[in-house]
Amino acid sequence: MAKQVVFDETARRALERGIDALANAVRVTLGPKGRNVVLEKKFGAPQIINDGVTIAKEIELENKLENTGAQLIKEVASKTNDVAGDGTTTACVLAQSLVKEGLKNVAAGSNPMNLKRGMEKTVRHLVAELEKVAKPVEGSQAIAQVAAVSAGNDDEIGEMIARAMETVGKEGVITVEESKSLTTELEVTEGMQFDRGYVSPYLVTDQERMEAVFDEPFLLITDKKISIITDLVPILEKVARAGRPLVIIAEDIEKEALATLVVNKLRGVLNVAAVKAPGFGDRRKAMLQDIAVLTDGEVISEDTGIKLENVTTDQLGKARKMTITKDNTTIVAEGNEAAVKARCAQIKQQIEETDSEYDREKLQERLAKLSGGVAVIKVGAATETELKDRKLRIEDAVNATKAAIAEGIVPGGGTALLHLAAGMGGFIDSLSGEEKIGARIIQKALEGPLRQIAENAGLEGSVIAEKVRNLEFNFGFNAMTNEYEDLVAAGIIDPVKVTRSALQNAASIAAMVLTTECIVVDKPEDDKTPAGAGGGGMPDFD
């Protein structure tokens, strides 16, 4: 296919237009008074949403050059979501501000490579400063505040997530699922999560979220390497007759067997997924046994004389729900409390008896996974549209809470970034030449999130930013009440991990845009549809 090649300022301005199109759609959702965005869906009702990364993923521009810019911002949102699970809108606003400020300086004659170096040094400096001012999250009240802010100032959700954290522990598993009722409830059940994902992306059930989600699945748990599909055929037929999904947890599944599973899954013959077993060596066997106890199944192993072709559905594990992503598998089990308690007691005994520090650590890890359970937040709402939006908000809140526990918190509402910008004078003086301009680009862009929060609340962003700049570090603008106050005391707080990821990802993409000198895209094809032929018959006469 023929390519379109665009250079210099034309290329950068095309990227900027694409960045603006996407960022302007996302930025209206920022802050407690942020608005919603309606997404048209090919099937079903439109989706009304307030989640930055979900909006970004939906946007595809007609102009190929501009679409390249939009895809770059999409990358910022997606990467921030992967790392921190929240802060995607802030990342988009920062990236847009950085690109705008940077392009002004490039157009004025600054060298893009020097600007890039200055920006990179400034981001490293700001990340170090964020770590210095971070406060650890202590107590369930602080956890509830972080969760409430991320869920759109919903105190009920904040308290529910704090209760979930108390129950399953800070490292525990919290899942969010849709409820059949109108109310949102918290339920704690047996379950575990391990760090292995699906072996093939073709096995996902939800293409948008790239997850395989199964209700009431059977689990085939084996320490064997499955290399030929004939070993599996008898049990696959039994499961298909039972009409339930099957999740295979095995040492490995080789190409031929996997290809057959994928083909049958795509044809709709089987609802199946496969996951590699967690751990290594003897520890793997022990972890498979843990999963078997949790799900009331058996480990299919040559050691116990059970062959794959002879397995019955009674020997399979049973779960209430399973969610498999590219990195993790979460099992929500049926009530099998007595067996789980007995297994936990056995592991505790091993912890007491072992002399090896390494073994003790690994046994404690297994005990935590098995005994911690899974907290399930069942989201209820009056309509499907509200349910989807509420579920996304709660997922953001869970991620933000975990991020806050990991790296601490800073004042929210864009305040921390603005105060850090105000204190950059000494650092900028330590830089040389055009690197100073790169630092000033970041300094100016750090105002972006606070300005946008104020504008979404119907106020003049620059006036609010100027007032906040002269306040103490913890003090800022509360857009919910339109008051200037101590934001940490008021519970308006952001996780450092979210703020840091947003800044790093935005600066990375902005530096790439500024140093772009050429874009190559597919040339739009001309419409080759032949013109309609003239109608036959007699000509018209006056």
UniProtKB/Swiss-Prot annotation:
It is an enzyme of class 5 (isomerase). Its main location: cytoplasm. InterPro entries: Cpn60/GroEL, Cpn60/GroEL/TCP-1, GroEL-like_apical_dom_sf, GROEL-like_equatorial_sf, TCP-1-like_intermed_sf. Transmembrane segments: none annotated. It catalyses: ATP + H2O + a folded polypeptide = ADP + phosphate + an unfolded polypeptide. Keywords: ATP-binding, Chaperone, Cytoplasm, Isomerase, Nucleotide-binding. It comes from the Bacteria. Its EC number is 5.6.1.7. It is found in: Cytoplasm. GO terms for biological process: chaperone cofactor-dependent protein refolding; protein refolding; response to heat. ATP binds at T29, L30, G31, P32, D86, G87, T88, T89, T90, G413, D494. One of its GO terms (molecular function) is ATP binding. CDD domains: GroEL (cd03344). GO terms for cellular component: GroEL-GroES complex. The keyword Nucleotide-binding applies. PANTHER family: 60 KDA HEAT SHOCK PROTEIN, MITOCHONDRIAL. Together with its co-chaperonin GroES, plays an essential role in assisting protein folding. The GroEL-GroES system forms a nano-cage that allows encapsulation of the non-native substrate proteins and provides a physical environment optimized to promote and accelerate protein folding. Belongs to the chaperonin (HSP60) family. Forms a cylinder of 14 subunits composed of two heptameric rings stacked back-to-back. Interacts with the co-chaperonin GroES. This is Chaperonin GroEL 1. It comes from Gloeobacter violaceus (strain ATCC 29082 / PCC 7421). The gene is groEL1.
